[in-house]
Amino acid sequence: MKKIINFILGAFLALNLSASVAYAAAKEVRIAFFMEWATPNQEDKVKKAFDRAFGVPVKWTNFATGGEMTEAMLSGDIDISYSQGLTPFVNAVNAKAPIFLVDIAVLYGMGGTTCVVSNASGITKANASDLEGKKVAVPLGTMADYVFKETMRVVGADPSRMRVIDMNPEDGSAALVNGDVAMACLFGGKSIKKAEEAGSKMLTVAEAKDAGIAGIDITSVTNKFLKENPGMVKAFVEVTHEANARYNSGKSDMNVIAKDAAMDLAGTKKQMGGFEFPDASVMKKKYMNRSGILMTYLKVMGNMFATSENPALKNYGKVVTTKYLP
């Protein structure tokens, strides 16, 4: 009997040990995020909740654009990209990049991503076609690029006739203030605030909403990390959803979030006031189901940014999973 008990205990310990090793195959988790883009899970980032959930250290790296996040994932430097724009994700999977969409990070209106036109140019939505022939700053392949195309469609201007310059939001806002471009399309609280020192939004948040222009940021993971560390992916999503629930119930430490986002408290509250952090049930029923909003956006953007070299996928459901949602 003693031998049997010892055997069972030994087997139990071996099983737990193997499970632990499988869960913590990575010795470090490398996560991409954006500064000036305040989200509830930054409180958990600061308080090391992710490190505790993973059982290993976390290395957080700030990127200027979602395209840079993709490049870092492909080079093996990043495992998880948090709040990557849907546009750079679409561009990546159209190019057959080995990454997967596992969660929706943020839903937002055009308060967080917008196009600001120079006041000195005298251009508004009423004469937006005057932008044709002029320099416009756009971080190509990002959600701001999508907003640029959609905004120009709404105001009746032809983007192909503009001199589009690929600039990250910080540089784009500086170029607008310096008079080097007539319009800058950008994201991020500080960059938009800087741009508005010299310009005004082409469309108000309400006008953009009425036109159906909205943003979705997602969480993407490399296929390699997903295969080797599924438990860590699930842990990341769970901690993030716990943070979202805390924020939605008014219990987040906004001072901690603001400081980590490199923003002031008022700006952080204003920005996050325009964000939505849906729970898992809403995601499954409304966004990530076969005919859901996310899947529709993927198809629309996939075709919008498709090229002959990187055509749109026939089925974006193959690069999306709800398996890791709580």
Q: What is the role of each PLM region?
A:
Residues 8-18:
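Bacterial N-terminal signal peptides
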Residues 1-9:
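Bacterial N-terminal signal peptides that target proteins for export
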Residues 25-155, 163-166, 182, 186-189, ...:
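Short, glycine-/small- and polar/acidic-enriched structural segments
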